[in-house]
């Protein structure tokens, strides 16, 4: 490692401020030789201007890394001690004597005494106490704890001085015309479709007023054209208003005529009904063939309505109605193949899954463990069984005699006819409904 100082790598200074520093920077062979350029330069420098070189900005430790700085001497240490002690003594002497000796003051009894009197509100007796006030013990070297607040100047009651200025003068008509700026009117765009006067279009055009001192003169023909356009527009608006009014009156007239016509038709129909109500009905006027045709028409209409009603029913209801029409015995459980088995509430499985072991006796199935189905009886109970004609004592002749002599529907009303007994209650209800509909249509 190079032990040469850092300052030796730099060019030598032209002039050193102190001889000790200059001797430290100069090499031994060059000591005593002062450069001529430095002398001439120093002689040319004016008085009062310090001579600063680059060497002055280098720290002392970097100028010579092997330089030893001597420790302070005993005399310097003693001077610093005496100066510090004198400052602290000055601080302690400025404090009150009570702060420096609090214990002795308390023992000696120094302090201020005051008499404190109190009066009882109930007994109205006064008691006095003597209180001794002693200064609080404080550190003399502790900084002051009193917060210095900024002194705010009190508000002054002086009124605010008004700003005096001359009153505004009213502009004359000529000045207002000079300051008037016409509104910008485009000759190409008019999105809102406003009708703009020609005077405003000319006022914004600078070609007619190059000097800018007066309003451009408008030709009389332009004024006539503007007036003609306004008059034509007013006439067109008046015509549109008249046509709208005529159209409105015509519509009101048509509505009034329709109302009168409807009122007249209603009056005619009312008079016709009253006339027919007064005249007696002559049955001989009706032709027998007309009565037959009307009867056939009514029967055909009833048949079409019945077919329409049956087409809207479900399959089971349609089969039930067909069975009633044919006079067959139909129960609630089975209707021509549309079976609706009764549900067993405690069975929540399919018995077909448990009846696959029915053929256990068949040879060739030795892996079958059970000899019969498990829940076969429940499946048999769910099958349809007729409630009548069951038992060994019923033979074919007894069954036939019961079927021929049985009365299928009992009479609940003694005034009902035989035809009503042979029909079901549902069919009677539908026939009554159809009869009521025919009566309404005839009326």
Curated annotation (Swiss-Prot):
It is found in: Nucleus. Associated with the spliceosome. InterPro entries: SKI-int_prot_SKIP (IPR017862), SKI-int_prot_SKIP_SNW-dom (IPR004015). This is Pre-mRNA-processing protein 45. Pfam families: SKIP_SNW. Residues 1-37, 235-307, 402-443 are annotated as: Disordered. Involved in pre-mRNA splicing. Residues 235-283, 294-307, 430-443 have a biased composition (Basic and acidic residues). One of its GO terms (biological process) is mRNA splicing, via spliceosome. Residues 18-30, 414-427 have a biased composition (Polar residues). GO terms for cellular component: spliceosomal complex. The lineage of its organism: Eukaryota, Fungi, Dikarya, Ascomycota, Saccharomycotina.
């Amino acid at each position: 490692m190079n032990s040469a100082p850092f300052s030796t790598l730099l060019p030598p200074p032209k002039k050193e401020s102190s001889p000790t520093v200059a001797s430290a920077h100069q090499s031994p062979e060059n000591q005593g030789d002062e450069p001529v350029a430095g002398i001439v330069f120093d002689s040319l420098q004016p008085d009062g201007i310090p001579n600063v070189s680059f060497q002055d900005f280098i720290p002392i430790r970097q100028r010579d890394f092997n330089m030893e700085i001597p420790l302070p001497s005993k005399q310097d240490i003693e001077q610093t001690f005496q100066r510090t002690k004198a400052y602290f003594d000055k601080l302690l002497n400025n404090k009150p004597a009570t702060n420096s000796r609090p214990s002795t003051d308390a023992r000696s009894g120094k302090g201020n005494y005051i008499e404190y009197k109190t009066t009882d509100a109930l007994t109205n007796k006064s008691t006095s106490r003597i209180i001794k006030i002693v200064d609080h013990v404080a550190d003399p070297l502790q900084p002051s704890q009193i917060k210095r607040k900024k002194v705010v100047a009190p508000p002054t009651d002086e009124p605010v001085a008004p700003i005096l200025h001359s009153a505004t003068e009213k502009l004359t008509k000529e000045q207002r015309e000079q300051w008037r700026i016409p509104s910008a009117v485009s000759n190409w765009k008019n999105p809102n479709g406003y009708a703009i006067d020609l005077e405003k279009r000319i006022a914004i055009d600078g070609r007619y007023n190059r000097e800018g001192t007066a309003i451009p003169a408008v030709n009389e023909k332009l004024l006539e054209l503007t007036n003609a356009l306004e008059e034509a527009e007013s006439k067109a608006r008046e015509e549109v208003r008249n046509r709208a009014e005529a159209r409105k009156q015509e519509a009101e007239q048509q509505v009034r005529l329709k109302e009168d016509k409807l009122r007249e038709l209603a009056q005619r129909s009312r008079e016709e009904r009253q006339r027919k109500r007064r005249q007696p009905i002559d049955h001989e006027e009706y032709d027998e063939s007309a009565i037959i045709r009307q009867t056939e028409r009514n029967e055909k209409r009833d048949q079409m309505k019945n077919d329409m009603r049956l087409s809207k029913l479900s399959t089971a209801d349609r089969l039930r109605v067909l069975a009633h029409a044919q006079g067959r015995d139909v129960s609630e459980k089975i209707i021509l193949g549309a079976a609706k088995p009764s549900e067993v509430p405690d069975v929540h499985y399919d018995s077909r899954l448990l009846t696959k072991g029915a053929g256990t006796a068949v040879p060739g199935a030795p892996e079958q463990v059970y000899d019969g189905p498990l829940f076969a009886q429940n499946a048999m109970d769910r099958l349809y069984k007729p409630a009548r004609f069951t038992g060994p004592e019923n033979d074919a002749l007894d069954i036939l005699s019961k079927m021929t002599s049985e009365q299928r529907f009992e009479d609940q009303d003694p005034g009902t006819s035989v035809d009503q007994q042979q029909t079901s209650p549902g069919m009677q209800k539908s026939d009554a409904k159809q009869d009521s509909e025919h009566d309404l249509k005839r009326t």
